[in-house]
Amino acid sequence: MAKVEGSSENIVQDGAQPVKPRILLAATGSVASIKFESLCRSFSEWAEVRAVATKSSLYFLDKASLPRDVILYTDDDEWSSWKKIGDGVLHIELRKWADIMVIAPLSANTLAKIAGGLCDNLLTCIVRAWDYSKPLYVAPAMNTFMWHNPFTKRHLEVISELGIVLIPPITKRLACGDYGNGAMAEPSMIYNTVRLSYKPSTVNGSG
């Protein structure tokens, strides 16, 4: 059974305060997921890190390149971890474990799912169950035409109402060859945004 750093009892019931903040990093189906390893390394120098990857992100993300102390969870772990009543449910355990969540990159598809309340994979189940008194950051990555699409504007408005913090994309040459806005912010910018806004009082690990 896939578990989050030891038993669920230790996570939820012992009330121990971690020395470092607990950060859940997530990657979705964008070519910018090739930078996820760099993001994990940056955060793991400061925080206790766990990672979640959607099925599509695995086309770009090299699991073997992640830091050894960063456990990566996928949809397969969600479905293999529950056997009977009383077993921990992975997306709930991760929701309780994390003090902060960062989705980088956030694809247009996953943005639409979150805005619509869908929960059809491990990541979107965590977001649907998220305690919005705890910080949740997103760093979108998509083609310029998708970024400027009216649907994207609506979806960003919806997640803003939930209190989700946007780390805006940047303008550069995109993977498709187009030049424009839509590239994920650099990992250093994402890290600095989260680190500078961090308040120790947010550390609770109990959801």
Name each region found by the language model.
Residues M1-V138, N143-G207:
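A cross-family phosphate/adenosyl-ligand binding-site feature
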